[in-house]
């Protein structure tokens, strides 16, 4: 892996109130109060930077070994330094702010790799927590001991990054902190590089992470100068692909290009023009937008992430009559749905097209709405209750669909998403009994283009709904999440937003019928 040619951090001295203990390795400790500068061979103020280095190849640094990660960071960012902080993994979080303010590199631990890195950096002074046994790491260097719990550490050497330094960005995952994060932050600040936070290690998570990715992109070639800390970022190839998506692909309502976990959704369910199928059709499109936004707002106080309003539009409606095509499903014209899709896009509302196909297969019906599914804010739901075999009839039997048909439809939608450079699509499977998806274990649910959910459609008493939920959440295929439906009339009583979000696991998608 190509590295950044290290830089020199020129050091000056800074007077600060407080206490520091100056210890020359091999000598007794001496506590000095009101010290102007610790005596010893440290470089004085007025130092100048060496030539600026080139940016390193972008890399993902493992965050599990804090010591190894700190060595990798300093070796990438610094050529030499007059002073360095050496901390234990336990003390590092307390010292990170001080290290950043002082502009000092930070190393974690005192093992052989750290000793070797200290020899390369050639500092005259080591700053460490009081009582730290530096062992061979101290060498003949001056040691300044500080109390990590103190409000200030007294007079410490300070560094400054060269003005002509290479553009480097350090990426941190705030939702999955690693032991290496404190030193990563300290070393980035000491080197004058930016720290960008990307939840879940994914620049596509939300609007803030996309903005951070664009800030990194402004530096130039994404193949250089990006150091990501932690396993959540995946491989460097995965991170590079995600960065490319974050900076080039349209965003979902609420920001970002992956549906979850950067948001949750609350949807009005139904079909335009009729109140018989759900609340969505009880008003016109503008009224539905207003109502859905009000529903989502009721969930916001109970959510750990933003709640986005959504429509779940029954686009093909199960019918008791065979109809002209004999499939017991009435397909709404795409242009009728388009009015709602257009209005939803303008209002920041996500749309899921729900299929009740009768005797037609799901893929055939989905392809009828291909142009709508090419829109960035439109996903798909397969309602297996209404998927009939040739001799079955609605309301006489509960329909079902096998994994092969689900996978065929999902493959097509994933390809459509990929070929049209679209953000991830929500892909919903309705279910209230195991018979509806009889071989669910064979469904491939981890396609990166799709966020696949099982939508628990059970209604009735609290015990009945939770019984359905607890059954359906068992043995989910890898990559499949959970969704929930609240019924105004059939539930006794209707669950409140707080009660709904107290369910385990908390549903990503909630619809109202």
Predicted regions and their residues:
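Catalytic domains of carbohydrate-active enzymes, especially glycoside hydrolases
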Residues: 190-194, 250-314, 343
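Extracellular glycan-binding segments that recognize GlcNAc-based cell-wall polysaccharides
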Residues: 44-255
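Chitinase-like catalytic core of GlcNAc-active glycosidases
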Residues: 303-349, 359-375, 379-381, 388, ...
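Structural preference for beta-strand elements that scaffold enzyme active sites
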Residues: 263-267, 306-312, 348-352, 377-381, ...
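Bacterial signal peptide processing site
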Residues: 39-42
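C-terminal motif of bacterial Sec signal peptides marking the signal peptidase cleavage site
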Residues: 33-37
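N-terminal export and membrane-targeting signals
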Residues: 2-29
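Surface-exposed substrate-engagement region within the catalytic domains
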Residues: 171-174, 201, 205-215, 396-512
């Amino acid at each position: 892996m190509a590295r950044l040619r290290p830089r020199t951090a020129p050091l000056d001295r800074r007077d600060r109130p407080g206490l520091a203990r100056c210890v020359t390795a091999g000598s007794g400790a001496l506590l000095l109060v009101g010290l102007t500068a610790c005596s010893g061979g440290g470089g004085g103020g007025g130092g100048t930077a060496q030539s600026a280095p080139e940016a390193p190849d972008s890399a993902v640094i493992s965050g599990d070994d804090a010591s190894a990660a700190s060595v990798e960071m300093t070796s990438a960012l610094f050529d030499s330094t007059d002073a360095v902080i050496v901390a234990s993994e336990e003390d590092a979080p307390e010292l990170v702010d001080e290290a950043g303010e002082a502009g000092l590199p930070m190393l974690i631990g005192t093992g052989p790799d750290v000793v070797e890195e200290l020899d390369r950096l050639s500092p005259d002074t080591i700053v460490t927590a009081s009582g730290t046994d530096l062992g061979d790491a101290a060498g003949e260097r001056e040691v300044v001991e500080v109390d990590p719990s103190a409000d200030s550490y007294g007079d410490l050497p300070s560094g400054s990054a060269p003005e002509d330094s290479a553009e480097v960005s350090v990426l941190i995952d705030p939702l999955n902190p690693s032991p290496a994060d404190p030193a990563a932050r300290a070393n980035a600040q000491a080197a004058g590089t930016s720290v960008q936070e990307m939840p879940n290690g994914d620049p596509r998570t939300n609007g803030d992470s996309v903005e951070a990715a664009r800030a990194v992109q402004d530096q130039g070639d994404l193949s250089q100068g990006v150091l990501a800390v932690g396993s959540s970022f995946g491989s460097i190839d995965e991170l590079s692909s995600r960065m490319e998506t974050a900076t080039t692909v349209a965003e979902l309502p609420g920001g970002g290009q992956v549906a979850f976990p950067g948001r949750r959704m609350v949807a009005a369910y139904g079909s335009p023009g009729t109140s018989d199928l759900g609340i969505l059709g009880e008003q016109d499109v503008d009224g539905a937008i207003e109502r859905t936004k009000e529903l989502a707002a009721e969930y916001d106080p109970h959510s750990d992430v933003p709640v986005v309003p959504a429509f779940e539009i029954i686009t093909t409606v199960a019918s008791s009559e065979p109809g002209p095509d004999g499939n017991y499903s009435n397909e709404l014209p795409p242009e009728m749905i388009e009015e709602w899709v257009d209005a939803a896009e303008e209002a920041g509302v996500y749309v899921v097209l729900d299929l009740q196909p009768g005797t037609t297969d799901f893929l055939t019906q989905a392809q009828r709405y291909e142009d709508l599914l090419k829109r960035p804010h439109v996903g798909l739901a397969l309602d297996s209750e209404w998927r009939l075999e040739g001799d079955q009839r609605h309301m006489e039997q509960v329909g079902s669909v096998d994994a092969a048909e689900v996978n065929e439809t999902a493959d097509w939608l994933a390809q459509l998403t990929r070929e049209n450079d679209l953000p991830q699509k929500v892909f919903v499977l309705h279910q209230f009994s195991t018979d509806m998806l009889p071989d669910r274990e064979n469904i491939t649910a981890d396609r990166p283009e799709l966020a696949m959910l099982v939508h628990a459609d059970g209604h009735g008493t609290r015990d009945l709904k939770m019984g359905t939920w607890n059954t359906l959440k068992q043995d989910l295929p890898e990559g499949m999440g959970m969704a929930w439906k609240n019924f105004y009339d059939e539930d006794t009583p209707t669950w409140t937003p707080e009660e709904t979000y107290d369910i385990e696991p908390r549903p990503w998608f909630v619809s109202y019928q």
